[in-house]
Design a protein with these regions (language model features):
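Terminal, low-structured helical/coil segments at or just beyond the last alpha-helical repeat
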Residues: 34-68
């Protein structure tokens, strides 16, 4: 069974490929697997720099988090 980090990483891939809906769904699964949103956010924040390097716009990050 996939772990929370697996769902998060899959969400990152979907997002960088432009599939926002799939990314949000995968991030939602990561939150559920983590058991709470705060733990998800801690993990997500650690990956922000990598997301920016992959072409995600800094202004889009809070928008994505609002979708969750």
């Amino acid at each position: 069974k996939p772990l929370a980090i697996d769902y998060m990483n899959a969400g990152h891939v979907a997002w960088t490929m432009g599939d926002i809906q799939k990314a949000a769904a995968l991030y939602g699964k990561s939150i559920t697997a983590n058991g709470n949103r705060e733990r998800f956010l801690e993990m997500f924040r650690k990956d922000e720099e990598a997301l920016l390097k992959q072409g995600i716009q800094e202004d889009d990050i809070p928008l994505m988090l609002d979708l969750l």
